[in-house]
Amino acid sequence: MSQPHSVPNTRALALGALGVVFGDIGTSPLYTMKEVFGGHHLALTQDNVLGILSLIFWALILVVSLKYVLVIMRADNKGEGGILALLSLVQGQAPLRSRARWIIMSLGFLGASLFFGDSLITPAISVLSAVEGLEIGAPALHPFILPLALGILVGLFAIQRRGTASIGRLFGPIMLLWFAVLGVLGAIGIAKHPQVLAALLPIHAIQFFMTHGTAGFLILGAVVLAITGAEALYADMGHFGTRPIRLTWFGFVLPALVVNYFGQGALLLAEPAAVRNPFYMLAPDWALYPMVALATAATVIASQAVISGAFSVTRQVVQMGYAPRLVIRHTSATAAGQIYIPFVNWTLAAGVALLVLGFQSSSNLAAAYGIAVTATFAIDTVLLALLMRVNWNLGRAPTLVAAALFLTLDLAFFGANAVKIPEGGWFPLVVAVVVFTILVTWRRGREIVGARLHERGLPLAPFVESLLAHPPARVGGTAVFMTTDPSGVPLALLHNLKHNKVLHERVVILNVRYGEVPYVPAEHRLAVTKLGEGVFHVVVRYGFMDDVDIPKALAECPCGMDFDMMDTTFFLSRENLIPARGDGGMMVWREHLFATMARNAASPMTFFRIPPNRVVELGAQLEI
């Protein structure tokens, strides 16, 4: 579990969490009530308004507060959260059969794939909904809404390579102001029509379903907009800790959101014409443009959190062996977690731009929003149930009760969003399928390559014995041969010995392994085995969120070897993969996809941060 924090530190972390964790869910009031009543043409009666407010309130209580903040946040993996950390906890401790393990692993990575679909929609719908407020005061500005939103989003993606450390310290104070304004505006609205407070009672939600039946169920597809971003509270737990996030949620964010939603409901009862944009019309006329500016800043911050999350998840799947190596650049000299991945950044930028141009408005985008989020909710619940039963040793009855409650809610929201698939919900699902296909294809391809290399390789022990029996010429210095097969001789080493007839004075066979934990302690980073004849087998272990730096790891080697980088040469193998026309364990199209990804993967030299002038690359053809 996360360590307790001092009071001053907790306050600082709470302010930081405001600027990162709560951006997505905190900007939902911009469009939720508008979509519920405008998008579904729901009559603005008192019963309907109270019913919707009750649904939103209890969704915030049951899904966000109970499920995520109080229950799932107990499942920290060495202090880290998120669906992959949750998956690693289940995989690491549950005594599962191979097929069950494969199903659970697939569920976890499907959840990660769905996140990327959500990562495209969140910036688009958030920024669009913010700048659409300009139309209220000046309808003539309508033609400029799309260009302005695109300009803001393109600018946001363009500055990613420089990092956000310099402006990141402003995120917390801006979001503090945002939530304070949400609360004040909501309170003003409630004062005009305090009857809306009756919606705190769940009876109004129940009566709404009884009155509207199937139509009431379908409106859950818009109500879910109020809880998008719930998973971020768990995913960002490692950055801020459980206590600051819980205190900020219950003490500030949740009250501000509830009061604002209820204020919008009161406004709709008093002025039905406000349905065109109840959020902005809740503010006084003089405050419209300042509110647009503040909302735009808040949505940019929310989008930044999603983009940073996409970088983080990408690094995790790469280091877990489910995606090809990508160029990962660090944008901060002090914060290892602040990274920039050019390929992901510009892929997201292109996707977001296409969404804005294709859907044209936040109302149209709302149809695409929700399906990926609710599917992730359901996957989280399944993994949580396994964790509760196996890792937490809870009895069958409490596990079933909790799983039934959460899964009923998740599937209800998912079902209501499923009907929106033809209207736009297909988009995040297509993105998720593409990403999931890439992940499983890369994993399977690497397994096939590993098997082929093992077949062609030579076991380490006989190789070292052959050096003793037939010693080759030796030259000074250290040669490091990287390999994925911990028990075999690297092909680069065999090729070097075959063609050059010499070995370096000291030979290091280096195997990099990634564990199912976020971080590996420094004392467990290296394992060194002396094989004799100047040959060492070194295993370097990393967690899926560790900063990978091979020269740094070798410099800290506890084996009595002083690594002089100017006296060390790294020998890397680059396989030229040839698809085997479906005979290698994958369909032909997957073989070609894998070969394409392998050709375009970042060089090991770049990924492992090895100086280019110390690298020799040797190629080899390999049929997959």
UniProtKB/Swiss-Prot annotation:
Keywords, alphabetical: Cell inner membrane, Cell membrane, Ion transport, Membrane, Potassium, Potassium transport, Symport, Transmembrane, Transmembrane helix, Transport
Matches recorded under InterPro entries: K+_transporter, K_trans_C, K_trans_N, Kup
Transmembrane regions: 13-33, 52-72, 102-122, 139-159, 170-190, 208-228, 249-269, 291-311, 339-359, 368-388, 399-419, 421-441
GO CC field: plasma membrane
One Pfam short name: K_trans
Source species, domain of life: Bacteria
GO molecular function, one term: potassium ion transmembrane transporter activity
Chemical reaction(s) catalysed: K(+)(in) + H(+)(in) = K(+)(out) + H(+)(out)
Location(s) in or outside the cell: Cell inner membrane
Keyword set includes Ion transport: yes
Membrane topology: Multi-pass membrane protein
DNA-binding listed as a keyword: no
Family as reported in the entry's similarity comment: Belongs to the HAK/KUP transporter (TC 2.A.72) family.
Biological role stated in the UniProt entry: Transport of potassium into the cell. Likely operates as a K(+):H(+) symporter.
Name of the protein in question: Probable potassium transport system protein Kup
Lineage, uppermost ranks: Bacteria, Pseudomonadati, Pseudomonadota, Betaproteobacteria, Nitrosomonadales
